[in-house]
A protein has these predicted regions:
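Repeated loop/turn-to-beta-strand initiation elements of outer-membrane beta-barrel proteins
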Residues: 2, 43-47, 97-104, 143-148, ...
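Outer-membrane beta-barrel transmembrane domain signature of Gram-negative proteins
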Residues: 75-98, 104, 108-192, 317-329
Length: 361
């Protein structure tokens, strides 16, 4: 089977309801196209492929800003963003006909991304080329009470960014392997333990374990626990484009190498509990859930906007950084076709900024 999906939108009329001289909504146009193919035979083989294309152009700033005459000039303030992205992805899988619990699969993707933007007098150009492959095999150990998944992965990620006439390049090559074991005790208890080993061309060996537990007190009530670690390379500019609109300088404090931005990878441990209860009241269904999660960073790229009125500083964490989250949610359908959701969330996010642990904005 095949499918072709398209989506387009645009804003072509300038709007300034409060008459402050700046556009209330950016002008722009966007086009998305997705083409999908799927194939499956009766022998257990399945495959899916997709081709995606995106183009997105935006303009913001003062009402009478003309990108042809005023771009990167002091005449009028303007913002322009031009993004193009192309992606090819695929999944291939085989389920053994006589052993449905056994399968092998391959996930592939390739992405080309191009961003040409300007924010007032600052120009930002970014290119990214990425490839990803993940080979997965799953089966059982003895009986279906003991299942496992294992496989190999590969990430190739190339970044080339230029901001304020400074160029930052990095090439990430990350081969990896993983193993995941699942134990299921009837319908009461499930445990999943996993371990990943990745070798980064710059940061070397990375070990990331994880554990998930689930206990069903009743068919309607269950408790989940999760714990694990992870790492990533922060993308300073792509993740903080909202700060480009200011005229402040970007400063990377005490870079430890010439690789990329010169900062260490972010690493964190996270832990969490979830309690879910499903119920019926007056013949109508509902559910209640409560969550508590904590994340502790052993390293983090800190974005400091308060140290100086003329700078935005980036530096490696020196001290504590954590996030605590508690949430309660009630879902109920008092009448047919009427859903009610009540939720409360409490967040406590703190980071060490140049020696002082402060709330993260």
């Amino acid at each position: 089977s095949t499918a072709l999906l398209t989506h387009a939108n645009g804003v072509f009329t300038k709007m300034d309801a409060n008459r402050d001289g700046f556009l209330d909504i950016p002008l722009g146009r966007q086009l998305n196209v997705i083409s999908r193919w799927e194939y499956a035979d009766r022998k257990g083989f399945e495959t899916q492929f997709a081709l995606k294309a995106l183009t997105d152009n935006r303009q913001a700033g003062q009402n009478d800003f003309d990108p042809i005459k005023d771009k990167l000039m002091t005449n009028k303030y303007g913002i322009g963003i031009q993004v193009k992205q192309y992606e090819l992805s695929g999944k291939l899988g085989y389920v053994f006909p006589q052993q449905k619990y056994k399968s092998i699969g391959l996930i592939l993707s390739a992405i080309n991304y191009n961003n040409q933007s300007y924010y007032g007098l600052n120009q930002y150009d970014a290119k990214q080329n990425s490839i990803y492959a993940n080979l997965i095999y799953q089966s059982v150990i003895g009986t279906k009470l003991h299942k496992f998944r294992t496989g190999l992965s590969f990430i190739g990620d190339g970044h080339d960014e230029t901001f304020a006439s400074k160029n930052f390049k990095r090439q990430e090559i990350v081969p990896g392997a993983f193993f995941e074991y699942t134990y299921t005790q009837t319908e009461k208890f499930t445990a999943i333990a996993g371990l990943r080993l990745d070798y980064h061309n710059q940061y070397h060996l990375m070990i990331t374990p994880r554990l998930n537990l689930k206990y069903n007190f009743t068919p309607e009530t269950n408790l989940r626990f999760s714990a694990g670690s992870g790492f990533r390379t922060a993308n300073l500019f792509a993740e903080n484009t909202g700060l480009f609109v200011s005229s402040r300088q970007y400063t990377i404090v005490n870079p430890s190498s010439n690789y990329g931005y010169g900062l260490d990878p972010e690493k964190a441990w996270n832990y969490g509990l979830n309690l879910t209860h499903k119920f019926e009241l007056n013949g109508q269904s509902g559910s209640f859930s409560a969550d508590a999660y904590r994340t502790v960073f052993t390293n983090q790229v800190v974005v400091d906007v308060d140290a100086s009125s003329r700078e935005i500083r980036f530096y490696d964490l020196d001290g504590q950084s954590f996030s605590n989250s508690i949430q309660a949610e009630l879902n109920y359908e008092p009448w047919n076709k009427l859903d009610v959701r009540l939720a409360y969330r409490w967040l406590d996010v703190q980071t060490n900024y140049s020696g002082a642990v402060l709330q993260k904005p």
